[in-house]
Regions:
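Non-catalytic, structured segments within soluble enzyme domains
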Residues: 42, 132-401, 584, 595-599, ...
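Short, well-structured active-site flanking segments
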Residues: 110-120, 193-196, 255-259, 458-464, ...
Length: 687
């Protein structure tokens, strides 16, 4: 009995030494595992941090920004950019805008230190359930790191690096600075980077004008800009907006009344007008070309100017403010004048025929289907292609898109068969529309407003509306126009052709043509400094010149083909007499004329023969117009100026271009020439 009891007691009460050894082993194991874990974490930290990028791109935040080009009156001429981003400070935004983004993306932003462990754990559990990385749990600080320093690759390695960098970044920058970077860097769809560009693209306003409802919609975009784009997926965008507003209400960042007002606000989507490549398109393009050349690294080094970007990168990414001499009113009238002149020129040459002829019913239906009509074209007397459906002597019925109209024969009076041997005015006007067009023809036509000065209501237009149109013809001949302010050299208007959309070749700058009689004032100006006066007599008689080297004979004539005998120098210039001009050039010498041309800024090269007096040198319209500034400004030639100043995105001056003038003529010479050239307009070939 005693032995059994003793045995049971030993079995139920363990040896104290065994318990002690167990506790020792347990503590050693736990400590070892903890040390191994710490060593593992330390190894991971060392591995993850060995090739981490620096913070320079963030602490010295210089994102790609839109360069803005201004006209003379500070209106916007256009933009240059690769990413449509306008820098906006936090104090320029309404308070509810950043709060909306925080509600949607990171409501604990101002409480955590760059990493939100609860969000990470939540994302980890969802990813484990999904078997793949579906959710990131990134804070706004981590998103800034990802967008500016790391790739968008979804891996745990990248997430570890992202977390480490986010923790470090919050020691370098304040919360407000990080949030400002995020709100300017984020892509929000529709080609808009940052909240200012998004406000312009979606609502046609600046960021400071956004309502709570509008801010909530923008805040819902970062998660999936395409999916939640309100222009393409309005229902998804609305659902996401409601989520953001509900989160703002839950967090106490808006009141119930503000919430109710926001969810009931009807959003109006409209894009802020972009004037780029509209009026002044050739001017804008020439400014772009000159900026790239001026801001090249070599040129900046010569001028001692240090920039972060050079050449095209500076133009498209630096957010420059570029000020130009272009006067919008002058530019508008210059473009219209050139277009009207080219259209008038093509009409004088007669009717070339339809753009195309469509014989089959299927082809005609396809044309109407594939060529919708812009209401703005109707409103502004624009041009469209129309399909002729029926023709009578009195006119033609036409279709365009889903609309119909009529071209009366009175609009076709100029549509004569081209005949270069007959003066246009002597050709009978067209009186039968059937001689011009037939059913199936596709022609250009211009809208004619019913009553001059009466506003056009596009909303009242229906498929049953009958439009009046005039037949038109697209010009084949091109032209250019340059207008320079002679006192400053400011190029107030520059047009390089009929349509920038059809051809970006800038004939005002890039094309060199013989100026012809426009060169004659240079000859006569030289003559005034070589013994001639306006009252001097010059013989207008046949002239024959034989080149000794080639034995070729040159027999120039006046435009009229007639000879006028002794002629006053004044009359010779006013009437643009070729033979008088050649005799003057022969008398004063070609070298003197070339020297005067160079003094006026013409670039040449110049042929050293008598033909130069009739304008055989090739010059650009811009170059020739600059030369003429000396006649209009007391002999001072003003160097042409298109760009007046350049500033950085932070309004720091980079370059200022002051007017540059050079004395090319004496004031007396310039006065006499200006007087004679006025007579050209009043009573000569310019009349």
């Amino acid at each position: 009995m005693t032995k059994t009891a003793t045995a049971i007691r030993f079995a139920t009460i363990p040896d104290k030494n065994i318990m002690k050894r167990f506790l020792t082993y347990f503590l050693v194991s736990v400590t070892g595992l903890a040390l191994l874990g710490m060593l593992g974490l330390g190894g991971i930290y060392i591995w993850a941090t060995k090739d981490l990028p620096g913070f320079t791109r963030i602490t010295d935040y210089r994102p790609p920004l839109v360069t803005t080009v201004y006209a003379r009156d500070n209106s916007i001429l256009g933009y240059f950019y690769r990413e449509k981003r306008f820098l906006a400070r936090l104090d320029e935004m309404p308070q509810h805008l950043p709060l909306a983004f925080l509600a949607a993306e990171d409501d604990s932003f101002y409480r955590h230190e760059g990493i939100d462990f609860r969000a990470i754990l939540r994302a980890f559990m969802k990813n484990m359930q999904a078997g793949t990385i579906r959710q990131g749990g990134s804070t706004i600080t981590q998103q800034v790191i990802k967008r500016l320093l790391l790739t968008s690759e979804r891996s745990y390695e990248r997430k570890i690096k992202e977390a480490i960098l986010a923790y470090r970044l919050e020691r370098y920058l304040s919360k407000d600075e990080i949030l400002t970077i995020y709100l300017n860097q984020i892509y929000l769809g529709a080609g808009a980077y940052g909240v200012e560009a998004a406000a312009r693209s979606y609502f046609g306003k600046h960021v400071g004008e956004l309502s709570i409802a509008e801010s909530a919609l923008l805040a819902g975009l970062p998660q999936a800009p395409s999916k939640y784009n309100p222009l393409n997926n309005p229902q998804d965008a609305y659902t996401r907006q409601l989520y953001v507003l509900h989160r703002m209400l839950q967090l106490g960042w808006i009141t119930p009344s503000q919430y109710d007002a926001a969810i009931n606000e009807k959003l109006v989507f409209t894009s802020m007008a972009d004037p780029s490549w509209g009026t002044g398109a050739w001017y804008l393009e020439e400014v772009r070309r000159r900026l790239i050349d001026y801001l090249s690294e070599d040129n900046m080094e010569k001028l001692g100017i240090k920039l972060e970007r050079y050449g095209e990168d500076a133009v498209y990414e630096s957010g420059l403010h570029v000020y130009t001499a272009m006067d919008p009113k002058h530019q508008k009238y210059a473009e219209q004048s050139l277009r009207d002149g080219l259209v008038a020129s093509t009409k004088r040459r007669g009717w070339r025929g339809p753009v195309e002829h469509l014989e089959s019913k299927e082809a005609r239906e396809a044309f109407l289907r594939d060529n919708p009509v812009d209401a703005a074209a109707m409103q502004h007397e624009g041009w469209i292609k129309v399909l002729v459906t029926r023709v009578t002597a009195a006119g033609a019925d036409v279709r365009f898109g889903s609309y119909k109209g009529r071209m009366d024969v009175e609009t076709m009076h100029w549509c004569r068969t081209p005949d270069p041997t007959v003066v246009t005015d002597y050709v009978p006007a067209v009186k039968d529309a059937r001689t011009v067009v037939k059913a199936g023809d596709v022609v250009w036509a211009q809208f004619m407003l019913p009553d001059a000065g009466k506003s056009f209501d596009a909303a009242s237009v229906t498929p049953d509306t009958d439009f009046s149109l005039a037949i038109a013809q697209y010009p084949e001949v091109q032209g250019a126009l340059v207008s320079i302010e002679p006192q400053t050299g400011d190029v107030v208007a520059l047009v390089g052709g009929y349509s920038f959309a059809d051809s970006q070749y800038n004939r005002a700058v890039q094309a060199k043509r013989q100026p012809g009689s426009a060169f004659k004032p240079i000859v006569y100006s030289t003559a005034l400094d070589n013994g001639y006066t306006p009252a001097s007599t010059v013989l207008d008689a046949p002239f024959v010149y034989t080149d000794d080297a080639t034995a070729k004979t040159w027999r120039p004539e006046n435009f009229s083909g007639e000879f006028y005998g002794p002629t006053l120098l004044r009359t010779a210039l006013v009437k643009s007499r070729n033979l008088c001009t050649i005799r003057i050039a022969q008398d004063i010498g070609i070298p003197a004329i070339v020297e005067r041309a160079k003094a006026l800024g013409l670039e040449g090269p110049f042929p050293f023969d008598l033909s130069v007096s009739l304008g055989s040198v090739a010059v650009s319209p811009l170059n020739l117009t600059e030369a003429y500034t000396a006649f209009a400004h007391e002999g001072l030639r003003a160097q042409h100026r298109m760009i007046t100043g350049i500033k950085s995105a932070w309004d720091e001056p980079i370059a200022t271009f002051e007017p540059q003038q050079t004395e090319a003529l004496t004031p007396q010479n310039a006065y006499i020439m200006a007087s004679l050239m006025k007579e050209v307009v009043r009573d000569g070939t310019g009349f």
